[in-house]
Amino acid sequence: MASGRKAALDAALKKIEKDFGKGSIMRLGENVHTQVDVISTGSLKLDIALGVGGYPKGRIIEVFGPESSGKTTVALHAAAEVQKQGGTAAYIDAENSLDAKYAQALGVNVDDLLLSQPDTGEQGLEIADDLVNSGAIDLLVIDSVAALVPRAEIEGEMGDSHVGLQARLMSQALRKLAGTLNRTGTIAIFINQIREKIGIMFGNPETTPGGRALKFYSTVRLEVRRSAQIKDGTNIVGNNTKIKVVKNKVAPPFKVAEVDIMYGKGISQTGELIDLAVDKDIINKSGAWYAYQGEKIGQGRVNAISWLDSPEHKKEHDEIFTSVRDQYGIGEKKDSDEDPGDNKKSKDSASDPFDDPNYNPKSSDPGDDLSDDDIY
């Protein structure tokens, strides 16, 4: 009896593979990897907060937050990292607001960056689908979900009601994109804005536009918010920014990366390197002085950053960088000649939010409650 069932199952598996191709069905243990294949976010602190060392390949990432909080900066750093590894990045600029000079300052090779500024939401998502289907890009950024305006709304009159149009558009697009992204190993970053729900007396009144589909399909959701200003004397030169991992399917969520975003320069990568190195005693801090291997490298954080940033101290910078990554258990940085487009599949490291001591089931995450546009 048992042998007959096994023979029937084997025959069914062979037929499925013949009809739909090898790999269309498999036993779970055949595809288990101990490490998720990732691409660095461009921020060490964010790599650590994500738990796996970067953005998981083949997945959807949502980055949301208030205006001018650093959402585009986070996405551009990812594009720069992909290009450093020899990959290709594409940017769907639905807001028509991408600053090429700023992108270049963050390390993006603007000559190689694929850019599209679509007229309608449908056009932007069709372009995104074609790019991902090609299997030739490694990162797709859509900026932003709120700016993906349906064609019917653009062609209609001011004041016309278009309930659920954008939610329906996003739901349909994500159903198509999710499988293709997984197959090609492409990372898709959706930048999103926030809105306020009218009439909410208790809980968080904030929500994100575009319906609920993106929240479900996202493997990682990042909330980006400014927390303080950074001043040089009386001049404001940047913002201290908190990036909270509000959803994570590949590692425990709810971790926070606190970074400095400097105007015109992006995330202060050397600054966060020093902070992490001090936490692990790789760099010693005594009073205002910072020292590495017994040698003083600067009085005050700004001077220590300048010391590490100087070309003559590149060796020390690289040593500290490697030590920090090893200490935090996120492995070695991949060689620049490795193709990030290699489609190495991995199994989700399932995480239960109830295992996290900071988890609060009553907390209101932006977008948890339905609005008129959230019917899909």
Swiss-Prot record:
Listed GO biological process terms: DNA recombination; DNA repair; SOS response
UniProt xrefs under Gene3D superfamilies: P-loop containing nucleotide triphosphate hydrolases
UniProt binding sites for ATP: 65-72
Cysteine disulfide partners in this protein: none
Pfam families given in the database record: RecA (PF00154), RecA_C (PF21096)
Assigned keywords, A-Z: ATP-binding, Cytoplasm, DNA damage, DNA recombination, DNA repair, DNA-binding, Nucleotide-binding, SOS response
Biased composition (Basic and acidic residues): 331-350
Family to which this protein belongs: Belongs to the RecA family.
Protein name per the record: Protein RecA
Species the sequence originates in: Oenococcus oeni (strain ATCC BAA-331 / PSU-1)
Gene that encodes the chain: recA
